[in-house]
């Protein structure tokens, strides 16, 4: 399955369809329709959160899905598919790719990322695994563990990379990521315009994930209203 999945997303746009509990569009049904609209617009893949949303989306579309499970724990800052339990739950949906936090930060219950990856590969040998990284150190770490894809998802969202943007300094961080691994790199995080999506692919990324700029109406509206307020 791996090679065919990779071919399907190569050079394309993956749309992240997520709405958390405190957001107006929080609904598996709504996310399934959001995903359908994204695919009709040309998306080659969908990134989705929770098994419930994923299953609803699977009933509407047939492109590859990057599945995650956002869950907060008191003893760790890691929240994207943080423990073996969440990784297993997402794998059980049958998604083609499962993404998880691959930073060097302490995980909930002191679980070890290497142990999680080794265990889950034995259970789901045909599933691809994507590393959501923040720093270059994370990239090296994820690469050494054998992740199938490296994502820049958490750049700007960890304590170490706070307030940074992937487009800063002419995409300098992304360029460093591309130099640091031979694995396919998925650009993700604060890619908020079509031109940025095109640029990251031109730089050599395997695919690009865009979320809020497409699927979060409140964020899109705020960008317009903030600009109008400058009058």
UniProtKB/Swiss-Prot annotation:
Gene3D superfamilies per record: Aldolase class I
GO cellular component terms listed in the entry, alphabetical order: cytosol
Domain of life per record: Bacteria
InterPro entries: Aldolase_TIM (IPR013785), NanE (IPR007260), RibuloseP-bd_barrel (IPR011060)
One Pfam short name: NanE
Record's keyword annotation contains RNA-binding: no
Pathway annotation: Amino-sugar metabolism; N-acetylneuraminate degradation; D-fructose 6-phosphate from N-acetylneuraminate: step 3/5
EC number assigned by the record: 5.1.3.9
UniProt-listed CDD domains: NanE
Broad class of enzyme this protein falls into: isomerase
Any single biological process term in GO: N-acetylmannosamine catabolic process
Catalytic activities: an N-acyl-D-glucosamine 6-phosphate = an N-acyl-D-mannosamine 6-phosphate
GO molecular function: N-acylglucosamine-6-phosphate 2-epimerase activity
Keyword line: Carbohydrate metabolism, Isomerase
Function (record text): Converts N-acetylmannosamine-6-phosphate (ManNAc-6-P) to N-acetylglucosamine-6-phosphate (GlcNAc-6-P).
HAMAP family: ManNAc6P_epimer
UniProt family annotation: Belongs to the NanE family.
Full protein name: Putative N-acetylmannosamine-6-phosphate 2-epimerase
The organism of origin for this protein: Listeria monocytogenes serotype 4b (strain F2365)
